[in-house]
């Protein structure tokens, strides 16, 4: 953790307590750390552990016909940019904070009950960046419906106003040549390339498993955040097709 002398130490206490709470919720143990004086507050954790080889989720192996499911709304980077500009509404801030503070633990518990083709978490490369990665590794094409994807409250409006983090433009430059945009509005591209903090799980699952998985998501309380965003198709000239 890095922390400046000019801030109240009670803030540091809250940061450490919040981190410890999430570590405990995840079922892990916090075993130590280092602290330094810094001009800006910084906090982060690294994870060390073991996983059974049969329980590893791969980010490749998607099969044509699979259904693509996303467990959280996207747009956290854009909402955070609006917060920095002091233009975010209180309700948008609350929703973004709730989503970012939510672990993927419940989603993982649902996913591990099924024989999914592939699964990854959406982070700094944005939804499209991770879709490109997964589709490329699987040698398939993803067909995504931009209007079926769940977005955070007001994220579209903030993106329309230009409140887009620099990372979104870097993500776009990296993989836009692999995306068939069609007539999709530029604002939606900003949302799809928006770097996510604590993003959800992107899951590729067979149609046979899809309905039962969605039933379990609803029963687990994720019905307000999970969305079916598209399907997997045989590989074409582009890795991603937007509709």
Task: Place the predicted regions along the sequence by residue.
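Helix-biased detector of long, well-ordered alpha-helical tracts
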Residues: 1-243
């Amino acid at each position: 953790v890095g922390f400046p002398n000019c801030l109240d130490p009670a803030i540091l206490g809250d940061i450490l307590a919040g981190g410890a709470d999430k570590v405990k919720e995840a079922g892990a143990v916090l075993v130590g750390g280092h602290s330094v004086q810094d001009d800006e507050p910084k906090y982060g954790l690294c994870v060390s552990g073991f996983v059974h080889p049969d329980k590893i989720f791969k980010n490749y192996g998607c099969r044509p016909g699979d259904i693509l499911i996303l467990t959280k709304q996207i747009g956290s980077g854009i909402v955070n940019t609006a917060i920095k500009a002091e233009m975010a509404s209180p309700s948008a801030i609350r929703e973004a904070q709730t989503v970012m503070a939510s672990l993927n633990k419940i989603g993982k518990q649902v996913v591990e009950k099924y024989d999914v083709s592939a699964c990854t978490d959406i982070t700094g490369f944005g939804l499209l960046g991770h879709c490109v990665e997964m589709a490329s590794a699987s040698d398939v094409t993803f067909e995504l419906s931009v209007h079926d994807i769940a977005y955070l409250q007001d994220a579209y409006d903030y993106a329309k106003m230009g409140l887009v983090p620099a990372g979104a433009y870097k993500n776009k430059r990296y993989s836009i040549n692999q995306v068939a945009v069609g007539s999709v509005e530029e604002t939606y591209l900003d949302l799809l390339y928006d770097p996510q903090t604590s993003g959800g799980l992107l899951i590729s699952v067979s149609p046979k498993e899809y309905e039962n998985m969605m039933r379990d998501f609803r029963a687990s309380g994720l019905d307000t955040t999970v969305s079916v965003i598209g399907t997997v198709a045989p590989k074409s000239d582009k890795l991603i097709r937007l509709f």
